[in-house]
Each structure stands twice: as C-alpha cells, then as structure tokens.
C-alpha cells in the first residue's frame, strides 16, 4: 500500500502511468482474495485430520475456532480491499470522463462566443458601410446638392422621377440647377408631343418653329453657326429644308448636352420653349396652300 501511494503521488508520472498503477493494485487485491480460497480449504483438511487422530480433541477444537475467526477476518479484509480498489478505480474513471466533458464544453463555449462576436462585428461593419447610389454618373447631382440627398438602395423607384424631385426640393431659388441629359430629353419629348397635338393655320408658325427650335443649347460660337445655317436654308427652300434642319439640330443638341455635363456643369442651359410646332403640322400647311391657289385660279 505504501509503494502504491508513493507511486501515485509522484508528479513525474503521466496520466496513463497513474491509471496503470491503479489497475495493477486492483488486480493484485483481487488475486489475493482468489488465493484465500485454497488456504481455507487446506486449513479445513488439516483440522479434520488432527481432530480424528489426536487424543487431545478439546485443544484441537480451540485451535480450530481461533483459526476460523482469523480466516474470516482475513477474508473480510481482502473483500474490503478489493471493493475499495474497485470504487477508487470507478471514481477516477468518472473524474476523467467529467474532465473531458468539461473541456469539450469549454471549447464549445469558446466557439459559440467567437461565432457571436464574428456575427456582431460583421453586422456592425455592414451597418457602417457607405450606401452607394444606384445611378449613372450623368444622373448624379452636383456635390453641393448631393450632400443633402439620402439615397436608399432598397427602394427601387423611377430614377428620372427621383432626380426631378430631388432637384425641385433641394435647389435654391437664386442659383440655377445643373440639369442632366435625362431632363433635356424629357423636355424635348414633351415639346414634340405638345407640338403634334396642335395644327398650325399658316406658314408663319412653321417659320416660328424653326426659329424657336434653334434656341435650344446655345453654348458656343461654333454651335450658333451650326444652328443658324439650317435655319437660313429652311426659310428659302420651304418644307424639305425645315425637316433637314430639324434633323441636323438633333445631333448638336445631344452633343451640347454631354459637353455641358462633362466640361462645365455650372454653365446655365437655356430651356426650350414649351409651345412649339411639329414638322408634320408644317408639312401639312405647306401642301394645303397650293391646293387653295389652284381652286382660285380655276
């Protein structure tokens, strides 16, 4: 027992060596209990023979009683030793199992803590990210106005409508707004639709249309010359010249709109008049006048 205790208290021994020592002590106690059985059988045979052949039978009985008591005490002692060794081994096994379970629970708790921290950190980083507006660079407001506009990527409404509303709300009354290409295209389509709904009664309105359509995007000397040449030709030649002048004006309009947005966004752009006449109305008026003259001649 003393060697066993000293071996278990040695700190240089590993966990496997300690468990092996415990197993060896239990096996040794069990072996001693197993060897007690033949000793009791041999003692019983000796007592029986001495009682039959000896003349002092009373003394043999007294010795037999003493030996029986000692053998019983020894057997009980061995049983207690085996039971204590077994209980000790079972307790140490449970302790090892509980230690491993505790380590596993600690590792799982650390993993859960790390996962929770990662989720919170990722959510915080996503919330701190800047919201990028879902618009093209030609449709973004100037820097002075864009600072006060809050774009929401979750709300997917019409881009052109949001652009008009932002300009009408945020542009001050004294400073003119830098209008984008979408605004000019929208105003041009509205003017052409209004022009087709009304029919001109005379050829003077067609000349006024050719003059007013040339006012759109007057930004430089080169563009003024390019706009005036088709107008002069339209006044001389009539209807074909007016249609070709309108076609020639469409390309400079788009080019001037791009140049005004890229090169000088602060330059003021002249708005096209709302009341205009279409090319079709001028064409119909030009063809009605010869018919009327022919009727008068006849």
Curated annotation (Swiss-Prot):
Q: Which UniProt keywords apply?
A: Cytoplasm, Cytoskeleton
For whether the record's keyword set contains Cytoplasm, the answer is: yes
- InterPro entries, alphabetized: ABI
Would I find Protein biosynthesis among this entry's keywords?
A: no
Describe, from its UniProt entry, the tissues in which this protein is expressed.
Answer: Expressed in seedlings, roots, hypocotyls, cotyledons, leaves, stems, and flowers.
Coiled-coil intervals in this record? none
Which GO terms of the cellular component aspect does the record hold? cytoplasm; cytoskeleton
Please state where this protein is localized: Cytoplasm, Cytoskeleton
Indicate the quaternary assembly.
Answer: Binds SCAR2.
Query: Family, per the entry?
Result: Belongs to the ABI family.
Q: What does this protein do?
A: Involved in regulation of actin and microtubule organization. Part of a WAVE complex that activates the Arp2/3 complex.
- Identify this protein by name: Protein ABIL1
Which organism does this record belong to? Arabidopsis thaliana (Mouse-ear cress)
What gene makes this protein?
A: ABIL1
């Amino acid at each position: 027992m003393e060697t066993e205790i000293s071996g278990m208290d040695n700190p240089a021994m590993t966990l496997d060596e300690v468990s092996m020592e415990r197993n060896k002590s239990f096996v040794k106690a069990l072996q001693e209990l197993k060897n007690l059985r033949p000793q009791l059988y041999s003692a019983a045979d000796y007592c029986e023979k001495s009682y039959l052949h000896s003349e002092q039978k009373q003394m043999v009985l007294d010795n037999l009683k003493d030996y029986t008591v000692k053998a019983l005490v020894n057997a009980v002692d061995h049983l207690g030793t085996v039971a204590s060794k077994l209980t000790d081994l079972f307790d140490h096994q449970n302790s090892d199992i509980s230690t491993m379970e505790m380590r596993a629970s600690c590792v799982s708790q650390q993993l859960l803590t790390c996962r929770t921290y990662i989720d919170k950190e990722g959510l915080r980083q996503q919330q701190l990210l800047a919201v990028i507006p879902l618009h093209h660079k030609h449709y973004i407001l100037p820097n002075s106005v864009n600072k006060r506009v809050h774009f929401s990527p979750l709300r997917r409404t019409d881009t052109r409508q949001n652009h008009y509303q932002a300009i009408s709300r945020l542009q001050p009354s004294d400073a003119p707004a830098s209008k984008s290409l979408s605004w000019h295209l929208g105003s041009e389509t509205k003017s052409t639709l209004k022009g087709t709904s009304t029919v001109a009664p005379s050829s003077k309105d067609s000349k006024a249309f050719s003059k007013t359509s040339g006012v759109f995007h007057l930004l430089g000397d080169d563009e003024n010359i390019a706009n005036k040449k088709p107008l002069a030709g339209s006044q001389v030649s009539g209807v074909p010249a007016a249609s070709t002048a309108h076609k020639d004006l469409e390309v400079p309009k788009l080019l001037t709109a791009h140049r005004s947005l890229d090169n000088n966004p602060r330059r003021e752009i002249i708005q096209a008049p709302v009341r205009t006449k279409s090319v079709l109305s001028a064409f119909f008026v030009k063809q009605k006048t010869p018919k009327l003259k022919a009727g008068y001649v006849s």
